[in-house]
Amino acid sequence: AGITGLSVACELMEQYADASVLVIERGLLPTGASTKNAGFACIGSLSENLHDISLMGENGLVKLVQDRYEGLHILRNRLGDHNIGYEACGGYEIVLKGEDNGFIDKLDDMNALLYPLFNKNIFSLCNEKIAEFGFSASHANKLIHNSEEGQIDTGKMMNSLWMYAQKLGVKIITGAEVTSLDESEQGIIIATQEMNFFAQKVFICTNAFTKSLFPNIELKPGRGQVLVTKPIQHLKVKGTFFFDEGYYYFKNFEDRIIFGGGRNLDFDNESTLHFGSNQKILTQLNTYLKELILPETTFEIDYSWSGIMAFGTNKLPLVEQIS
């Protein structure tokens, strides 16, 4: 019953109003990354997009950005910006001192490549905002703005999506973990620890947890660490921000900072399906808060959490018919 599962259920009911659609959720609330993501409505930073071109070519990158952009608009149109807390605040990529910034020379090329999607140039240098946001000038070298990014309120969005699905007639059962799927001549038997369900068609929208049902699928889990500061008076940071090829990400939420990432510091331990903290990564997040993001501001950490994502052989959605 995360973003993918509920969105699929809503799409089915929108197209087939008389259908009987049931969503089965293993947790009391959606368990994976949907309720634990930090609320970034992003389509890809300049350095990330250039890296993706090396993996999938220019046409592949354009299709990926288009899918992200259109997917966000489907969510916004379906639920309404107010109901998901959407803010078109823009996205920013911080280029750190000492970091190879040769990719900035390709900014115009990237704008030209993506221009047909947006009918405008979406990337621009805005180094003057480094001081405006209060970042450390000894650590932040350059700042790149992406006009088409924003942020959402994750809790508000999931609550709205849940209510919208139920309004359409989607049934949702929580606290029922699916243990197996077995095909029969009459349809598919969905086994849980408590009882079995029967369906003609099943959509598997379990993301990182799909391997428990299909061990051979090419998906790897990736845990993300996130921390939240206590409210900060006169907070200068406004918007969504990324650095180190998107491995670190932060944004303001009201008068707090939500900061996550650092998975690249410990890939092995973060490739797990178990929720929990990683002290090595949390220490680095604290260091970046002190030295880069809030160098002249006293702050305290309020709490932290982890969420589990899934990664395939590339960044494209894994959508296929199993049987």
Model region roles, listed by residue range:
Residues M13-K36:
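Glycine-rich FAD pyrophosphate-binding loop
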Residues A137-K201, C205:
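Helical element adjacent to the flavin cofactor pocket in flavoenzyme catalytic cores
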Residues I190-V237:
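Central helical "cap/lid" subdomain
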